Amino acid sequence: GDVYKRQVMGGSLAVNKRVFKHVQIAEKISGLRMGPDDAYLIIRGLRTLDTRLDRHEINTKKIASFLSKHKKITVLYPYNKGTKDYKMWKKYYKGSSGLMGLKIKYRNISSIDRFVNSLRLFGYGYSWGGFESLALHQKIKEQGKRKYLNLSKDEHIVRLHIGLEDPKDLIKDLKNSLKFIR
């Protein structure tokens, strides 16, 4: 159900008694505190985190391999051999995540929106580490001044988070939507 889609954030605060009184007042006014159900969901999710992260990695490697073969796409995923960040990734990391970027070359900007909007198994939005796959076309103004991207005037970024779905189904969905990239 929807219980898995909930976003939960937690933290702790270490303060002296004088400041704590102010924190209590602010907490009562705002209602910002973690309830027992939220704490339970966090604990339950942590129990399967390593298994889910392994599945994200396996699925994402398959998707990245598939997308790397497309002539109008540069996959921004350091796990892929031959990428400029692969050596650094190999030196410092043991695994990879479900997050990647696609640098897409286009003739018509609306083709990128059609690509993203035609995906059936991908939700639309920002997230990282959730169970569902997501896609998001990042507009130029959202990309900031990331000089390392070296985007030309006819390239945009689509951000993908690969979830826990069957990678064969995700590849089929991507394949059907890639026809819109012109």
Regions inferred by a protein language model and the residue ranges of each:
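Short, small-residue-biased leader/transition segments that mark boundaries at the very start
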Residues: 1-4
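Short, solvent-exposed loop/turn segments at the edges of secondary structure
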Residues: 6-9, 95-97
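Conserved core segment of the aminotransferase class I/II
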Residues: 9-70, 114-119
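Well-ordered beta-strand positions enriched in small/hydrophobic/aromatic, beta-favoring residues
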Residues: 11-13, 75, 100, 135
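Beta-strand segments within the central parallel beta-sheet cores of soluble alpha/beta enzyme folds
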Residues: 24-28, 74-79, 158
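Short, well-ordered beta-strand elements within core beta-sheets of diverse protein domains
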Residues: 42-51, 98-106, 158-163
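Conserved small-domain helix->loop->beta segment predominantly found in fold-type I
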Residues: 61-120, 124-130, 143-149
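PLP-dependent enzyme catalytic core of the Aspartate aminotransferase-like
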Residues: 106-107, 118, 133-182
